[in-house]
Design a protein with these regions (language model features):
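Long, charged low-complexity intrinsically disordered regions
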Residues: 1-172
């Protein structure tokens, strides 16, 4: 017996990552169409990267359309992005894209992109959760492939045994 302390942000990150990865592998990513496409300007080298990886980005739910010489319209995003700053996330993604379309490098970078998007969309550490939300998070976490670590490898929960706790209170 003891007390299990769960980091809600890391736990939710694992849940989102597993869902997103599974959806990505099944090519069934839930997307959100933007009511007003986001116009973003890029450097010529970034435009080249985006054109090269447009199909792969589409598989992640990011629908881009070249608009003029150095601009893209972002038409859809993965539904898990919710209200996050889509332009900032796109900038991070562009920075992560490999220079070549080498399959192994692309797979590795997309793994990093999935992790980043999951992290950005996870419940924040200081956010209060009610009992139902806590139960749902723990239930969802138990259904993941690796419920003990986040995609970065950090532990999700720590178990403090009762004897250690009692010693802290000078009871043993």
């Amino acid at each position: 017996p003891g007390i299990l302390v769960v980091d809600q942000h890391i736990a939710h990150e694992r849940v989102l990552y597993d869902r997103f990865k599974k959806s990505s592998e099944n090519k069934k990513i839930e997307v959100q169409q933007l009511l007003f496409p986001l116009t973003m300007e890029y450097s010529p080298s970034e435009v080249e990267l985006l054109v090269r990886h447009k199909g792969s980005l589409s598989e992640l739910g990011l629908e881009l359309e070249l608009f003029g010489k150095n601009e893209f319209l972002l038409r859809t995003v993965p539904a898990i992005l919710k209200n996050n700053d889509k332009e900032e996330i796109m900038r991070e993604i562009v920075d992560m894209l490999p220079a070549q379309k080498h399959e192994e490098a692309l797979h590795e970078k997309f793994e990093e992109i999935l992790i980043m998007m999951s992290c950005r969309n996870a419940i924040k550490v200081n956010m209060s959760l009610n009992l139902d939300q806590i139960r749902k998070l723990i239930s969802d976490l138990q259904e993941t492939e690796m419920p003990y670590t986040c995609p970065h490898g950090r532990p999700i929960a720590l178990l403090y045994d009762i004897d250690s706790i009692l010693k802290k209170f000078l009871r043993k």
